[in-house]
Structure formats: structure tokens, C-alpha cells
Design a protein with these regions (language model features):
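Outer-membrane beta-barrel "beta-signal"
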Residues: 34-36, 242-255
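Cleavable N-terminal export/targeting peptides
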Residues: 1-31
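Transmembrane beta-barrel strands of outer-membrane/channel proteins
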Residues: 35-43, 91-95, 152-158, 203, ...
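Extracellular/periplasm-exposed beta-strand and loop segments of Gram-negative cell-envelope proteins
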Residues: 44-71, 94-133, 159-195, 226-246
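Short glycine/proline- and aromatic-enriched beta-strand/turn motifs that initiate or cap beta-hairpins
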Residues: 20-84, 89, 254
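Membrane-embedded beta-strands of outer-membrane beta-barrel proteins
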Residues: 77, 136-138, 152, 199-203, ...
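Repeated loop/turn-to-beta-strand initiation elements of outer-membrane beta-barrel proteins
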Residues: 86-89, 148, 209-215
């Protein structure tokens, strides 16, 4: 949370200083618009845990499902136009995907012995999480020389989250004396839509140009965030954040 606040304050400061810096550089952005395509990584973490208690063989059993999703690869594309001087209006889309292994643990009562629960420990492999977002951005371009410029931007973000979640567990007895128990998880793809925000910066260096277009290479940083909930065991829901710190490189087209 502290890192998010610091990032937000830094970007806001850049926004405040950008017009003054552009004036100091003595340039108004001359291009009519841009198309950016990039690849990178989203750095973020979402740890989820759900605990349920249920009657089993006349006693109370406990099941715990946990999963932690971390950084994933990212694809990003954006387009925008100059609306006034160095002010731009644009829209961007990013897609990020990663997977993880979840864990199922618990204490399961015995059908034979009272107050002698069996310990359950099982791995749930290949839980997928896919994040998509559309960002509407207002930006300000700061030209630095003839070939290099930096654009700072921000605006609302509209996220779509598709995530695999363990929503139920079927238990099965093993062994002649019921000493062990196994679990077969029910995996459900949970889908959520949520609105958040984004702030960021994009740097471009032009490597080739003619009378119509300019081509370049660039890098970007974006911090995007929204919060929602996902269903886990039974009817329980757990909070999760989407977005995070995003970094990447790509190609730039100016027209």
C-alpha cells in the first residue's frame, strides 16, 4: 500500500511539472497521434486463502484452500491523438497471464475413531489467472530534442479478471483402516469486472522517419490497480487486487 502511494505521488508530480518542462525545452509536440505496441511484465502478488468447517462423520472437519498469484508476462497496445498542444487523449489495452499451484489442507474426522482426525495435504496444479484491462488516458508529451520525448498519463481503467478457483472438495477414503483421505477439488473459472485507475510514463526514441510517419523504440512504466473479490470454498469470497506495477519495451509509430 505504501509503495502504491509513493508511485502515485511521483506520477502526479511529473504531471504537474510536465507543462513547465515542455516550455523549458521550447517545443510543442508536432505529431498528430501515436500507436504503441509493447511486451513486458506485471509485478504484483495476490495471496488468497479460504477456510470452511463442515460436519463429517458426526464431527467437525476443516478444509483450507490457499493460492498465491505473482508476476506474469504482459502484452500492451495503445493508440492516441493530440488534442491540444502537447495534450493527448488515448486508449490502451493490456493482457497479463500467469498460473500457480494451490494448496488444500485440513483436518478430516475418521469414520472409525472419534476425535482422531486425519491430516489432509494436497497440491492443486495449474490454477490459471488472466487479467485484461482497457485504460482511458489523458497524457502530456514532453519533447526532449528532435528524436526523444516522454509522455506522462493517467486515467480510469476497466479490468476483466478470469481466475481458476477451488470452490468445492470431494473427499475419498484410502486404505483398509481409513488412515488416509484424498481430495478431488472442483475448479471453477471465476469472472469479475471492476473499475480502477492507472498512471504511467512512456519514453520514445525515433530511429527512422519520412514525411508521413516516424518509427521508434520505447519503454513504459504503468501502475494500474483495482480491487475485487473471488469466490473460493463454498460461498466464501476473498479480496484480491488486479493490476500492479507494469514495465515493458516495444515499438512506437508516430503519425
Amino acid at each position: 500500500m505504501k509503495r502504491s502511494a509513493v508511485t502515485f505521488l511521483i506520477i502526479c508530480s511529473v504531471f504537474a511539472l510536465a507543462p513547465r518542462q515542455a516550455s523549458a525545452q521550447g517545443g510543442t509536440w508536432a505529431d498528430r497521434g501515436y500507436i504503441n505496441v509493447g511486451w513486458g511484465v506485471e509485478s504484483g502478488s495476490s495471496a488468497q486463502s479460504s477456510t470452511v468447517s463442515k460436519p463429517i462423520y458426526g464431527e467437525t472437519g476443516t478444509l483450507v484452500s490457499t493460492a498465491t498469484f505473482t508476476s506474469g508476462s504482459l502484452f500492451d497496445v495503445g493508440v492516441g491523438v493530440r488534442v491540444f498542444k502537447n495534450l493527448t487523449l488515448g486508449v490502451a489495452y493490456h493482457q497479463e497471464q500467469n498460473d500457480t499451484d494451490g494448496q488444500l489442507t485440513g483436518n478430516i474426522p475418521s469414520p472409525v475413531f472419534f476425535n482422531r482426525p486425519r491430516t489432509l495435504s494436497s497440491t492443486v496444479s495449474g490454477l490459471d489467472r488472466k487479467e485484461m484491462a482497457t485504460h482511458v488516458n489523458i497524457g502530456w508529451v514532453v519533447p526532449i530534442g528532435q528524436k526523444f520525448d516522454v509522455m506522462v498519463y493517467g486515467g480510469p481503467s476497466f479490468f476483466r479478471l478470469n481466475q481458476d478457483s477451488v470452490t468445492d472438495v470431494t473427499l475419498a477414503e484410502q486404505g483398509g483402516n481409513f488412515t488416509t483421505v484424498t481430495a478431488a477439488p472442483t475448479i471453477t473459472e471465476v469472472k469479475k469486472s471492476v473499475t480502477g485507475y492507472n498512471v504511467g510514463a512512456d519514453a520514445t526514441y525515433i530511429v527512422w522517419s519520412n514525411d508521413s510517419i516516424r518509427l521508434g523504440l520505447g519503454g513504459f512504466f504503468r501502475f494500474a490497480k483495482a480491487s475485487t473479490e473471488v469466490q473460493m470454498l463454498g460461498t466464501t469470497t476473498q479480496p484480491t487486487d488486479v493490476g500492479g506495477s507494469q514495465y515493458g519495451l516495444g515499438v512506437r509509430l508516430r503519425f
